Amino acid sequence: MKFEEEKIMAELRWNPLIKDWVMIASHRQNRPQMPKDWCPFCPGSGKVPDHFTVYKYDNDFPALSQNPPEPDDVETRIYKTKPSYGKCEVILYSPEHTVTLPELPVPHIRELVDLWTERFVEISKDPKIKYVFIFENRGDVVGVTMPHPHGQIYGYSVVPKKLELEMESCKEHFEETNNCLICDMLEDEVKDGRRVIIENEDFISFLPFYCEYPYGMYIAAKRHIQNLTQMTDREKTNLAKILKETAGTLDSLFDYTFPYMMCMYQNPVNGEDVSDYYHFHIAFYPPMRSADKVKFNASSETGAWAHCNPTAPEEKAEELRAAHEKFLKKMNG
């Protein structure tokens, strides 16, 4: 049997079982291994400016593109394809190669918040973009290949399934109660108090009642807002503060750079108005359940979306509050 020469594919393919789109991006397999003594994100590499604080860098191997190729002719009566239209950007947090988010001063993180805001606005101008997703992967255990401190932004041409489910739940709650679901969640968390870790004038960091990961903290805005552009100057600075303290709390648990996935949830763009019922929040998904043990998303979590947290959130919240105190003492030196 003769096999065809390997072909580069970049398209979206429809999963009819759960009504969701899968990104096919075979060209990402060809990402080169970087030499250990060279980093494209460091000043002097020729890839980035010699002087910057934070910086937007177009992904060299994007899963989504604003000039995507036509999909392969593989559609059937069941299977659908569409172009892998979208935007993939890298957001460099600092010119320093080994610094981490909680080690940056608040004014520096505030510049990062401003850059996120600027990119949210710019990417949203494209009418084909339906969701702007800001995120960070940190640590080898979540597959990070570039240690230089950075996050990413994806502009999707569809609203991803999980976010669609969140919107539906929030809308249903609003129609039943005339309240925002996340506003009500915050009210319950504050009233209970046991899972609240950090609080400032504008944001709360807490371990949700239902958290799937032992140390999976959320940050939510106290005011009912949907995205970064609606924040006041004070709110943006307080977001920078609570991001620093939340990431620093995780690092202080076991005195090492704690791996995590950080995801920012904002309203969809160029579509239905969700301002009555959706609410800005950030979720941290740290894959560790102890200093040296990983909480794997195994068969139940992956195959059934049935998550099992092997710890009690109320007990882990006590650990996190102690780690927060430890971080503050270190920060205030």
Which residues fall in each region the model found?
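A contiguous, surface-exposed recognition patch within enzymatic or periplasmic domains that forms
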Residues: 226-235, 239-244, 273
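Extended C-terminal subregions enriched in glycine
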Residues: 238-257
